[in-house]
Design a protein with these regions (language model features):
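Transmembrane beta-barrel strands of outer-membrane/channel proteins
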Residues: 36-40, 88-92, 130-136, 163, ...
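Outer-membrane beta-barrel translocator domains and adjoining extracellular loop/strand segments
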Residues: 46-55, 97-104, 140-148, 185-193
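Predominantly the C-terminal beta-signal and adjacent terminal strand-loop region
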Residues: 47, 59, 168-213
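Cleavable N-terminal export/targeting peptides
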Residues: 1-31
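Short glycine/proline- and aromatic-enriched beta-strand/turn motifs that initiate or cap beta-hairpins
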Residues: 28-82, 204-213
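Gram-negative (and chloroplast) outer-membrane scaffold detector with strong preference
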Residues: 71-144, 200-213
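Repeated loop/turn-to-beta-strand initiation elements of outer-membrane beta-barrel proteins
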Residues: 32, 82-86, 125-126, 165-173
Length: 213
């Protein structure tokens, strides 16, 4: 019998795919958009760092992360040009781990693939909006003096709010705030000694341009 946790994880991992299928199935009367975005990610430290593997259960100090540039893109739709929409949102940042005492820092890259439900005010010129949804968090830890190269995939969540302003009937500029949270498990980071679990949080600010059709 499959463990219920794995069933839940597979379900959430499939949500972006289900969102993509839903976007394809949206009626032709929908308002579609594609967008590019760039900004800055203010990552909090990796908290609740606990070892896994042969020496599991040891609590370590928080791993401070650097702020970094973030960039990505979106595709979404508002069925029947209404207030409720769906979007796929992908963004990438590099919140490298800062130096740990006498040890050098560790390169860390995070890709967030989000499937969001979005609610907007459908104004002609200005459209404030907010949204939320799960995200597939792909985090890659590079080889360093203290760690082995390791990649983890986990489920996180995204909350976003912003406002777009149409400069032409089809082109809009937007600014957006996004909050992201997830559990990261790098279980092979320390090689034969195991790895660690941790909690990731980030605040991100984006500027972007979208094309609506």
């Amino acid at each position: 019998m499959m463990h219920s946790g794995r069933v839940g994880q597979r379900f959430f991992l499939s949500l972006p795919l289900l969102t993509a299928v839903s976007l394809i199935a949206i009626p032709a009367q929908a308002e579609w958009y594609v967008a590019g975005q760039a900004g800055y990610s203010f990552a909090g430290p990796l908290r609740n760092v606990t070892t896994t593997g042969p020496f599991s259960g040891i609590e370590l100090q928080d791993f401070d992360l650097n702020n970094s540039v973030a960039y990505g893109g979106k595709i979404g739709a508002y069925p029947f040009h209404g207030s409720l929409g769906f979007e796929l949102d992908v963004n990438h940042s590099t919140p490298h781990v800062k130096s740990l005492g006498d040890s050098p820092g560790i390169h860390l890259a995070v890709t967030n693939v989000g499937a969001n439900i979005v609610l907007r005010y459908p104004g002609v010129t200005f459209q404030p909006y907010l949204g939320a949804g799960p995200g597939i968090m792909i985090a890659r830890l590079s080889r360093s003096a203290e760690t082995q190269q390791d990649t983890q995939v986990s489920i996180g969540f995204n909350f976003l709010t912003g406002i777009r302003a149409f400069v032409t009937p089809k082109v809009a500029l937007f600014t957006e705030y996004k909050y992201t949270g997830a559990k990261f498990g790098f279980h092979d980071a320390f090689g034969s000694f195991g790895g660690f679990d941790s909690t990731y949080r980030a605040h991100q600010l984006f500027l972007g341009v979208s094309y609506h059709f």
